[in-house]
Amino acid sequence: MLGKLLTKVFGSRNDRTLKNLGKIVIQINALEADYEKLSDEELKAKTTEFRTRLENGETLDNIMAEAFAVVREASKRVFDMRPFDVQLLGGMVLDSNRIAEMRTGEGKTLTATLPAYLNGITGKGVHVITVNDYLATRDAENNRPLFEFLGLSVGINVAGLGQFEKKQAYDADITYGTNNEFGFDYLRDNMAFSPQERVQRPLHYALIDEVDSILIDEARTPLIISGAAEDSSELYAKINLLIPSLIPQDKEDTEDYVGEGDYSIDEKGKQVHLTERGQEKVELLLIEKGMLAEGDSLYSATNISLLHHVNAALRAHTLFEKDIDYIVQDDEVIIVDEHTGRTMPGRRWSEGLHQAVEAKEGAKIQNENQTLASITFQNYFRQYEKLAGMTGTADTEAFEFQHIYGLDTVVVPTNRPMVRKDMADLVYLTAPEKYAAIIKDIEGCRERGQPVLVGTVSIEQSELLNSLLKKANIPHSVLNAKFHEKEAEIVAQAGSLGAVTIATNMAGRGTDIVLGGNWNMEIEALENPTAEQKAKIKADWKIRHDEVLAAGGLHILGTERHESRRIDNQLRGRAGRQGDAGSSRFYLSMEDSLMRIFASDRVSGMMKKLGMEEGEAIEHPWVSRAIENAQRKVEARNFDIRKQLLEYDDVANDQRQVVYAQRNELMDAESIQDTIQNIEQDVISGIVDQYIPPQSLEELWDVPGLEQRLGNEFGLKLTIQEWLDQDDNLHEETLRERILTSWSELYKAKEEMVGAQVLRQFEKAVMLQTLDGLWKEHLAAMDHLRQGIHLRGYAQKNPKQEYKRESFELFQQLLETLKNDVISVLSKVQVQAQSDVDEMEQRRRDEEAKIKLAYQHASVEALSDAGEQQIEAPKTVIREGEKIGRNDPCPCGSGQKYKQCHGKLS
């Protein structure tokens, strides 16, 4: 109450932000008359003037008003479109490391040109990021004339480009592309073997379209570059046959309840658990099939892999449904995006789940993948110096944007008042009653000529409605993962008089639904249309547009509430664009998954009290509130999952940053001779200390062991015992120096034989290849550690703390092994000439050619912390512009100085 009162008096934070930015809008508008008088050449010259002023010390804030005024004037001349004041506000929000919530149809694409131009002037690169290749290409080509008129270059970064084309795209002032491609390019750059192979410049400014989709919905999906691991397809097929014989039970066993089934399903957490009986039954079945030794346990250390396969098969059979979570096409299992309803060819679930689903469906089982490099979108995008985004629905996720990314959300007002009528939900007892009411509503709209967009949450639902509409003889279009080829065309015509369109979730997002149909597409369909033809198409469209408005505008019809309020708001937001008329209503039943899992008891109780009959619906604010509370619960749970994933990935990210920074330093260096000498001293000294402990008696020295180790690992054939017998003055320090001198002499002789330049190249190649191999093994070890870390909760230990501690130990091992392996290889390998270095490089390229990209879903199951009550707030990683100082604390969190920890490599 007090908060509302204060907001009334002082205005909300959003109002104050808009008021401050409004002052700059006044400045931009004041410049308009002067800029209209400039010739095209004078307007273009402004870009050079701005660049000169930036070089002379002015900031982007100093030139913002003038730059935005230039873009507005250029837009009028190139597109015959004048950005509204609210678009100027949106552009300023995007330039200030914030998220702009702009309603559908408010011109986000044109708004993005303002901050893109301003930041493009710097020459450091602007990345405009969209959700798919179609939108990236469309927006780049649409805006290219404007940017090129102002002297800025435009690049497009989509899948399938070669290295040269990618380099060109990234070297442009403004680069349009998809989140996947930018992320994959970052990982590929950090697997490169020479500076020339890298395509990205330092990450400067990212402007993300549909920011909620990329930073929220995709945040649980790490980008993974992987290579094929060992073939275990036969094992998946065998274990798949065991699962149908297992019996489900309603809930988990507890002290008060012991069921009779073999497994229980937790629908809220999307988990499945074997009961004790189920475990015994599976063990007996495995013994019968000869896959488990008599008397052995599924949970013994030697059978962890078998347990992994059983769990994957169980999840595939119980939690993943065909035509909802995936489709089978051409003997291949293709994931369906739960947020958009689109298929995602090339993406695979991780941890054997995809293979288990393939076995379940009788499709070809593909090999498991081994991770070579990975990063979450959260940690990729937080590396940008400036980050901003825009969407039609961000306010419900404002806390997460601020908490994870440090981005404030600003709701930008609409250019015209919004007049869409959002009607209360109608709740029915059963699904058939709900669908009967939906068909009746559609028939009513058809009679009025009002276009209808029906939003469904799954392919299965859209196909059910498809058949019901066919039975009712209602003409309609279907847009789901199976019919996505004509997506833009279907969505663009969804506003035609009397049109009925069924779409899964937010399919077609990014394409406006124009009332009366899209006249632009009609013009584009003609070859070389004349001015008369264009005028006639526009005139005909105006008549249709007015007819649709008179019929009530676009009617949005939701067949089920989504887990997230934001997705529901996105569906509603398709209607009422630019002040048009429109309406929306959701139809629900007690059999819907959200209602069944989260809101059933309370709402069912209300319905029973009201004594509802078949076909009757309930429409009450209490019901809407209960549904909204259910959605809040799901949103909170999903946020915790994303936050937890980030907390784990932050540990890996600290290590990733150290390894990638070291790797880039090695690659950019002319010579790493000093690094090799430092490592050689560390390694040899460490080995000497093992066999000749510091400050120990000579009787405790293991000289034969030291001679053997130096000979076997480093090719140093030394007679240390003879040295000691002949020289009484030798002690541990002088002995260490003599051994180091011997290694240096051996290495010097090798250098004289092959030449310094060849050896320097070989050193770099060995260092990079060894680091890459060990990093790959380290990632696999980290994956295994994370999958089992939740079990530490049963031992009353904090799983996250244990994960941090053990991953740090693994990283220390990686560094030690790297140093030993590099010195061992350099000591023993005989380099004859440049051809040996070239051959090594060619072998590396052949291996790289075998690598395939896989974009995989993270397994949330491995992140559930058993026994942990509280979830720590993740630390926001701020991108540092400066290099880490040698005496600064190491970023890995060990508490040691950088030079004594991960800085040892440099």
Swiss-Prot record:
The entry's keywords: ATP-binding, Cell inner membrane, Cell membrane, Cytoplasm, Membrane, Metal-binding, Nucleotide-binding, Protein transport, Translocase, Translocation, Transport, Zinc
Reactions that this protein is recorded to catalyse: ATP + H2O + cellular proteinSide 1 = ADP + phosphate + cellular proteinSide 2
UniProt region (Disordered), positions on chain: 879-906
Record text on cofactor binding: May bind 1 zinc ion per subunit.
Subcellular location: Cell inner membrane; Cytoplasm
GO biological process, one term: protein import
InterPro entries registered for this protein in UniProt: Helicase_ATP-bd, Helicase_C-like, P-loop_NTPase, SEC_C_motif, SecA, SecA_CS, SecA_DEAD, SecA_motor_DEAD
One family name in Pfam for this protein: SecA_SW
Membrane-topology descriptor: Peripheral membrane protein
Record: residues binding ATP: Q87, G105, E106, G107, K108, T109, D512
Keyword match Zinc: yes
Cofactor: Zn(2+)
Enzyme class: translocase
Gene3D superfamilies (UniProt xref): Helical scaffold and wing domains of SecA (1.10.3060.10), P-loop containing nucleotide triphosphate hydrolases (3.40.50.300), SecA, preprotein cross-linking domain (3.90.1440.10)
Entry annotated with the keyword Nucleotide-binding: yes
Chain positions recorded as Zn(2+) binding sites: C890, C892, C901, H902
Family: Belongs to the SecA family.
Quaternary assembly: Monomer and homodimer. Part of the essential Sec protein translocation apparatus which comprises SecA, SecYEG and auxiliary proteins SecDF-YajC and YidC.
Described function: Part of the Sec protein translocase complex. Interacts with the SecYEG preprotein conducting channel. Has a central role in coupling the hydrolysis of ATP to the transfer of proteins into and across the cell membrane, serving both as a receptor for the preprotein-SecB complex and as an ATP-driven molecular motor driving the stepwise translocation of polypeptide chains across the membrane.
HAMAP family documented for this protein: SecA
Record PANTHER family: CHLOROPLAST PROTEIN-TRANSPORTING ATPASE, SECA INNER MEMBRANE COMPONENT OF SEC PROTEIN SECRETION SYSTEM
Identification of the protein by name: Protein translocase subunit SecA
Lineage of the species this protein comes from: Bacteria, Pseudomonadati, Pseudomonadota, Gammaproteobacteria, Alteromonadales
Gene: secA
